[in-house]
């Protein structure tokens, strides 16, 4: 008798949603304290002046100012926030 074995189900067909990583505020943009500057896995970018780093390596502003990206020590890119000058009284 000619029988055909039952076909197995495919093991493909799944994918995970994108994690929405990357730069959220680019160089020169104005930020306020708490604004997320970028999301990353690991330390592709390092926190510079007036920037904090969360436990998931997210960089965020700690003061109001403009975002700045600079190359530094060991080829690392540092993200800083340059405070806006206070209005003269």
UniProtKB/Swiss-Prot annotation:
It comes from the Bacteria. NCBIfam families: L27 (TIGR00062). Signal peptide: none annotated. Keywords: Ribonucleoprotein, Ribosomal protein. Residues 1-22 are annotated as: Disordered. PANTHER family: LARGE RIBOSOMAL SUBUNIT PROTEIN BL27M, RIBOSOMAL PROTEIN L27. This is Large ribosomal subunit protein bL27. GO terms for biological process: translation. InterPro entries: Ribosomal_bL27, Ribosomal_bL27_CS. Belongs to the bacterial ribosomal protein bL27 family. GO terms for cellular component: cytosolic large ribosomal subunit. The keyword Ribosomal protein applies. One of its GO terms (molecular function) is structural constituent of ribosome.
């Amino acid at each position: 008798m000619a029988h055909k074995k039952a076909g197995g189900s495919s093991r493909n067909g799944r994918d995970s949603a994108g994690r929405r990583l990357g730069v959220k505020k680019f160089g020169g943009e104005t930020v306020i304290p708490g604004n997320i500057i970028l999301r990353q896995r690991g330390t592709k970018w390092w926190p510079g002046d007036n920037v904090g780093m969360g436990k998931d390596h997210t960089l965020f502003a700690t003061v109001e100012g403009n975002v700045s990206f600079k190359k530094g020590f060991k080829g690392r890119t540092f993200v800083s926030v340059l405070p806006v000058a206070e209005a003269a009284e």
